[in-house]
């Protein structure tokens, strides 16, 4: 049955959702965290998942709002799994520049469908250079199955996870082998773009991104996010390099108190100059990630037959799931990283 033939979702309550609700969620006190390798930083990933809840129609909103703290806190679990699981790291990126030469269009060269890409490059090659668009498609199918089973644990786990991968796909530096500027003398740009700029400026962004919409072609949606990110990559690198020429080293970097330690970081002045010259890019990519996350949750639910989630409300995550998450957190803090690090 096509989406158009499904019953229309009642949006009236959604439309009555006042701006006050979103302002309340933005007043949530986020601890400033610097992850070792997380796209958007832990701060950004949590905010993306949290605000995505407010894009949902009434049929999903009640359930997701009830579990908004879980979805927020566990938005970073996929990055933690990079410390615990082989095969996780490549789910977070795709090095498009390994597939094309200057002047070529990677999006006409790389097949979008997994089987066609495997036939052209081999699975080992794809895994080596990252699989994020295909993994988003896999995660959507897992979430859809969780809705079909009406399994609260799996709905929550896969909702949090897919939000993370979608967030990663909206980051330009997750589409290149030069993911941390290490090939162009710009080491550290990864954390600058996705963490430092967000932590300084996120409270000034406009998060009224509209309502979640059904995604007709999930794989194409994932690829479109990657394409938009990659199209911005040249500006990310070029503008930082140009700006560096205007700042003496002692003006580009500074030291800040982080907990009990004093750590080096990009200065506030350099960060703000970079953010300004990017001309809203970080905010645009974050807004696009938020609406895509909400739309993907909605799409998985629709494709599962629109199960009545009100029947699942007041059902907390199981102790088994919470124990699994605590074990993952312990492995993360123990810290044997499996995959690339962006410091």
Regions found by a protein language model. Name each.
Residues 167-181:
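Catalytic Zn2+-binding segment of zinc metalloproteases
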């Amino acid at each position: 049955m096509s989406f158009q033939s499904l019953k229309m979702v009642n949006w009236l309550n959604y439309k009555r959702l006042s701006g006050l609700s979103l302002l309340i969620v933005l007043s949530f006190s986020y601890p400033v965290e610097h992850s070792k390798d997380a796209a958007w930083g832990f701060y950004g990933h949590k905010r993306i998942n949290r605000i995505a809840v407010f894009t949902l129609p009434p049929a999903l909103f009640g359930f997701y709002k009830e579990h908004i703290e879980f979805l927020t806190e566990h938005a970073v679990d996929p990055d933690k799994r990079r410390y615990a699981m082989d095969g996780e790291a490549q789910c977070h990126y795709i090095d498009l520049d390994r597939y094309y030469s200057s002047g070529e269009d990677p999006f006409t060269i790389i097949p979008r469908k997994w089987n066609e890409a495997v036939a052209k490059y081999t699975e080992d090659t794809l895994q080596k250079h990252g699989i994020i668009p295909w993994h988003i498609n896999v995660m959507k199918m897992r979430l859809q199955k969780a809705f079909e089973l009406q399994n609260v644990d799996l709905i929550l786990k896969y909702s949090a996870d897919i939000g993370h991968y979608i967030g990663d796909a909206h980051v330009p530096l997750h589409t290149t082998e030069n993911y941390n500027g290490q090939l162009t003398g710009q080491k550290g740009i990864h954390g600058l773009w996705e963490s430092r700029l967000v932590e300084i400026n996120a409270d000034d962004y406009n998060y009224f991104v509209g309502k979640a919409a059904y995604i007709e072609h999930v794989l194409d949606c994932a690829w479109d996010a990657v394409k938009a990110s990659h199209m911005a990559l040249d500006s990310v690198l070029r503008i930082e390099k140009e700006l560096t020429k205007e700042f003496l080293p002692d003006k580009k970097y500074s030291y800040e108190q982080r907990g009990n330690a004093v750590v080096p970081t990009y200065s506030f002045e350099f960060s703000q100059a970079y953010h300004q010259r990017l001309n809203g890019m970080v905010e645009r990519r974050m807004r696009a990630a938020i609406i895509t996350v909400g739309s993907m949750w909605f799409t998985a639910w629709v494709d599962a037959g629109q199960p009545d989630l009100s029947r699942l409300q007041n059902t907390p995550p199981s102790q088994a799931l919470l124990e699994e998450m605590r074990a993952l957190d312990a492995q993360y803090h123990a810290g044997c990283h499996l995959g690339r690090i962006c410091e």
